Design a protein with these regions (language model features):
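CE4/NodB-like, metal-dependent polysaccharide N-deacetylase domain
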Residues: 20-47, 140-158
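Active-site and substrate-binding clefts of carbohydrate-active enzymes
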Residues: 84-119, 123-331
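A generic short-segment signal for beta-strand/edge and adjacent turn/coil regions
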Residues: 13-15, 36, 80, 126, ...
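Secondary-structure capping and boundary motifs in well-ordered enzyme cores
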Residues: 26, 48, 52, 256-257, ...
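Aromatic-lined carbohydrate-binding surfaces of glycoside hydrolases
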Residues: 1-6, 53
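Catalytic domains of cell-wall/extracellular-matrix polysaccharide-remodeling enzymes
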Residues: 30-84, 150, 163-183
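Acidic, His- and aromatic-enriched active-site or binding-groove loops in soluble protein domains
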Residues: 4-28, 61-101
């Protein structure tokens, strides 16, 4: 937290018990679920809200991931700390090259916030053909700027997979059809995936310093650093301490141990903390607040413990009117 939010208020507890091991558990479990559905191992991963740190990338290396991605804020903070060439920084030329942090292997791709937010927030109000033409025009401008080295570069567009389309007419079917028609036949713009781009020789650039943060404002502020969010963390830490104490006794059956472990994983989900705060709509905050506290109470019950009275007290009220009902953040 301190690397991303050095001046923000902190929870009472200074860290999450065995956080690194819990992160490994979630990745391992995620890989098992992925393999169950697709009978394959993914080559890359998008961590929650593109949250990155040096430790997180090191963990991805342990699991053999070839790529991950984040937002332009993390890229900019990292480039500034790494003293990347000022022209490449301010012109965003360095944004269009995958980076490799220190001695780590995992390639890092960073989102073009401008292009991505056009799709996420602006084009919904445009005529589909005009929007598609504008996007392709922007891509052509980038290609012209990159010049002869264009083949070594990748323009990264990332947005929430489902949240944008409900704000378009007909779930964006007209816009997407027009866009893919233009891109698929364009002589200079090639659609690709991160894995294919790496296989085809996208040039990796060294990044000495990786600043921690996410694609939301380039920090971890969507999860921590405000009173409501910090209190939610303290409740989770106390539940984890209880979990560890009960597990150390070895008294739970194998079935109860599994149930409690899976319930803990639900409580550790990042989206709970996303919703807490006065900037989100009250109805949504109220629902997520109540559900979060209920899930924590269920964890205590599975452990054979009485839920603490603190779980009866609401954490957050909301009251804001975030764009797109708070499901996406504009950068």
């Amino acid at each position: 937290m301190r690397d991303a939010l050095p001046d923000a208020p902190t929870p009472v507890y200074s860290g999450y018990p065995d956080g690194y091991e819990r992160a490994k558990w979630h990745i391992k479990h995620g890989l098992e679920v992925f393999n169950e559905h697709f009978a394959a191992k993914p080559r890359g991963v998008w961590l929650s809200e593109g949250a990155l740190s040096s430790a997180a990338v090191g963990l991805l290396d342990e699991f053999g991931f070839k790529w991950t991605a984040s937002g332009e804020g993390v890229w900019r903070h990292s480039c500034e700390a790494s003293h990347i060439d000022q022209h490449d920084l301010h012109s965003k030329k360095a944004l269009y090259q995958p980076l490799q942090h220190s001695s780590q292997n995992c390639a890092l791709f960073f989102r073009d916030d401008g292009l991505s937010d056009l799709i996420g927030f602006q084009y919904k109000d445009w005529h589909p053909q005009d929007a598609a033409n504008n996007f392709v025009h922007n891509m052509e401008n980038i290609a012209n700027f990159l010049g002869d080295a264009v083949d070594e570069h990748v323009v990264t567009v990332i947005l929430d997979g489902e949240n944008a389309w409900e704000y378009y007419p007909d779930n964006a079917s007209h816009f997407l059809t027009a866009l893919y028609d233009k891109l698929s036949s364009h002589p200079r713009v090639e659609m690709t995936t991160f894995s294919d781009a790496l296989d085809k020789g996208a040039k990796l650039r060294h990044l000495p310093v990786l600043k921690a943060g996410s694609w939301v404002y380039g920090s971890f502020s969507t999860w921590i650093g405000e009173a409501d969010k910090n209190k939610a963390w303290d409740l989770l830490v106390e539940a984890k301490q209880c979990f560890d104490k009960v597990m150390a006794t070895g008294e739970l059956s194998a079935e109860k141990t599994l149930q409690a472990t899976l319930q803990l994983a639900i409580c550790e989900g990042s989206d709970w903390f996303w919703w807490f705060g006065d900037y989100n709509p009250s109805d949504s905050v109220r629902d997520f607040d109540r559900l979060y506290r209920r899930h924590l109470a269920k964890l205590y019950e599975l452990l054979g413990e009485v839920p603490p009275p603190s779980l009866d007290i609401p954490l957050s009220q909301g009251g804001g009117q975030m764009e797109n009902a708070g499901t996406m953040r504009r950068n």
